[in-house]
Amino acid sequence: KCLSIGIDITKEYIPVAPAAHYLCGGIKVDLDGQSSIRRLYAIGECSCTGLHGGNRLASNSLIEAVVYADAAAKHALSVLERYDFNEDIPEWNDEGTISTEERVLITQSMKEVNQIMEAYVGIVRSNTRLTRAWNRLDILYEETEALFKRSKATRELCELRNMINVGYLITKQAMEQTNKKPMN
């Protein structure tokens, strides 16, 4: 197979790149599927229950997802009546903003976030790479916030802001991590 795509494994390495699916993690939850943020639940691949230890990709076992989904739903229903909900939400006011004609700016910035995270915050990490990632994300953040303030909020623009914020969170956690255990 490798030869058919131009890679001679007797003369060169097989290129390997990190992919999001292979990174372990998730939102730490309790037995009710609730995160450290009150009333925020996480189940399935976005959660980290610890049920299977460190050798599982997040918490993506089907049985685990079903059990935690059931627990989260039961817990949420049991506390639902304790909370008031604000139903008096004003209409969105985008007066003074313009439609984002420059979609290419958003698309390119999304590609840059992906490239930054793959190149500097992937499997192989160093303080130099993490610092570079942080600085690059900072530039993208400033550019995106400026665009957001003058544009109508679109799904793509909101997703870009979220991508940058998640990039910041992952990078910050990686910079603070002192216990670098390999996964089993």
Report the location of each language-model feature.
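Glycine- and aromatic-enriched mobile tails/lids
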Residues: 22, 28-42, 46-184
